[in-house]
């Protein structure tokens, strides 16, 4: 699709979203066609909700998020086939794999293990592996990435190349509020089991999160070497574990010591060469 066509599509969707109270299941024509076209672009990886520039800054294509939201107004509930034991679901969003056969899977080039769930408009790149996991609509999963068992990739989340999302990891989805950016895991990151990254936070390239690290917008991310406290973004090639910090007030009103509060701790930073040659367990050893 040309830049002119994309601009026209964006204009139609922006106007429809501004007038969304009048968009419903009876809406036909240009608006429905535009939303369908946008969802297809997302599904095929030809457009992304967020894109990284050469300067490392991520730009959010809000109009694509709006297309996803409009699709809920346009589409009725329907039976979704493919459940275990020939069971079905009841939803507005079909499976990405609806009507797929051998040819489609071979062309797509990724592995989809039984009981993984991928909703339409999510993109899965070649050589990715989906264990029994959940990938929500509008998400992007990069080439060679592993989405391990019971991991969740939320709506519009952006997962880079050669990322490992370990068992039970949660990558939060962000559709609303509209101004919020998606949660982003950049290339070559390792996210340890049962960790959670949510609320549009960014884990920069090559970083390692140990097991059970939770990062949201209000989570303190503390660099142990410098004492710097940051929020919302883990720097490139950081090794991060769960930790705690003393409260601002050393004692409570009753005289007892104040409880320590959770934080994420950057225990070390490594360069790209070290990261590529060093095992994950070795990096996480203190």
Curated annotation (Swiss-Prot):
It catalyses: (S)-2,3,4,5-tetrahydrodipicolinate + succinyl-CoA + H2O = (S)-2-succinylamino-6-oxoheptanedioate + CoA. The keyword Chaperone does not apply. The keyword Acyltransferase applies. Its EC number is 2.3.1.117. It is found in: Cytoplasm. It holds the Pfam family Hexapep_2. Its main location: cytoplasm. One of its GO terms (molecular function) is 2,3,4,5-tetrahydropyridine-2,6-dicarboxylate N-succinyltransferase activity. Keywords: Acyltransferase, Amino-acid biosynthesis, Cytoplasm, Diaminopimelate biosynthesis, Lysine biosynthesis, Repeat, Transferase. Belongs to the transferase hexapeptide repeat family. NCBIfam families: dapD (TIGR00965), PRK11830.1 (NF008808). This is 2,3,4,5-tetrahydropyridine-2,6-dicarboxylate N-succinyltransferase.
